[in-house]
């Protein structure tokens, strides 16, 4: 079995190499926040060692990759993908994973990361992997974006935002016969319906095999959530942008251009996501 392991660098690794004097000053302090960053680094390193040794001992052919080095080429011909980090690492990896390849998310430090898409943490991975064939699997629907009828970006697992790149500026766009002036338009998949759009006040969607998309107009008083299998939007913003699954991946959507969202290829995720989702929603006195 060919396994691709994708990891994130800890904040301590990134901060300790920064040339920013403010970051350097922060790292030199002995306060609680700086200590927490270093402690998390050791936890994540231990998770990495546990996971990789478990995979190697199983006889798997293991390739290890930093998440910024991901490409379609390196994800070809693999049998399984394992992400070590949090939801951000999982989302970034999902952009390069074909629908026939299963993926496991491992939360490298549960004290600092929610890891909603993670099946287990580092210390739990050996037991989880030994019973891999018995673990639940979910087919999560992804969305596909087109700008002026041209496929743009990777499959979208969580959400996509259209907005002015300046958060203090007005975003202008048209959907059908109606024009909007607000803080941007946020779309989410079923998997993403308990993420950003949920914190905007929208209700979660059922998780598995759900091709429905949600749409929410940010910054409009008493805005309602609409659902559909597809959405179309025309930008009336001169320098608008779309942001896919967070802040790291974006594309321009200039005035006059059209964004179309439809169902894309699904993603096979290993782990009991329904259990984690129910636990999360009980905090808000909600049930699916």
Regions found by a protein language model. Give the residues of each.
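Internal, charge-rich low-complexity segments
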Residues: 10-24
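Structural motif
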Residues: 79-80
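Redox-cofactor binding/interface segments in oxidoreductases and associated redox assembly factors
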Residues: 83-84, 187-188
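Short glycine/serine/threonine-rich phosphate/pyrophosphate-binding segments
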Residues: 89-93, 193-198
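Short, conserved loop/helix-junction motifs that constitute active-site signature segments
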Residues: 96-98, 206-207
């Amino acid at each position: 079995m060919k396994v691709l392991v994708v990891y994130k660098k800890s904040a301590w690794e990134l901060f300790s190499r920064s040339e920013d004097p403010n970051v350097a000053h922060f790292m030199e302090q002995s306060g609680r926040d700086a200590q927490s960053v270093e402690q998390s680094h050791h936890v994540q390193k231990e998770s990495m060692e546990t996971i990789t040794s478990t995979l190697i001992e199983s006889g798997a052919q293991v390739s290890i990759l930093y998440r910024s080095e991901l490409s379609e080429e390196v994800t070809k011909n693999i049998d399984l993908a394992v992400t070590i980090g949090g939801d951000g690492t999982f989302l970034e990896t999902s952009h390069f994973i074909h629908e026939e390849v299963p993926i496991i998310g491992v939360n490298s430090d549960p004290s600092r990361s929610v890891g909603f898409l993670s099946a287990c943490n580092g210390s739990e991975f050996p037991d989880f992997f030994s019973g891999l064939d018995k673990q639940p699997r979910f087919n999560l629907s992804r969305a596909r974006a087109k700008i002026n009828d041209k496929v743009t970006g990777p499959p979208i697992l969580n959400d996509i935002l259209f907005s002015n790149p300046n958060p203090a500026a007005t975003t202008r766009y048209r959907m059908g016969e109606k024009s909007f002036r607000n803080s941007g338009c946020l779309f989410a998949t079923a998997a993403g319906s308990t993420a950003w759009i949920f914190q905007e006040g929208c209700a979660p969607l059922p998780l598995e095999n759900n091709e429905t998309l949600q749409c929410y107009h940010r910054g409009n008083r008493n805005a309602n959530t609409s659902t559909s299998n597809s959405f179309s939007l025309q930008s009336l913003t001169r320098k608008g942008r779309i942001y896919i699954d967070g802040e790291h991946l974006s594309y321009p959507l200039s005035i006059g251009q059209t964004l179309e969202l439809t169902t894309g290829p699904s993603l096979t995720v290993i782990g009991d996501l329904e259990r984690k989702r129910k636990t999360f929603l009980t905090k808000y006195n909600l049930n699916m």
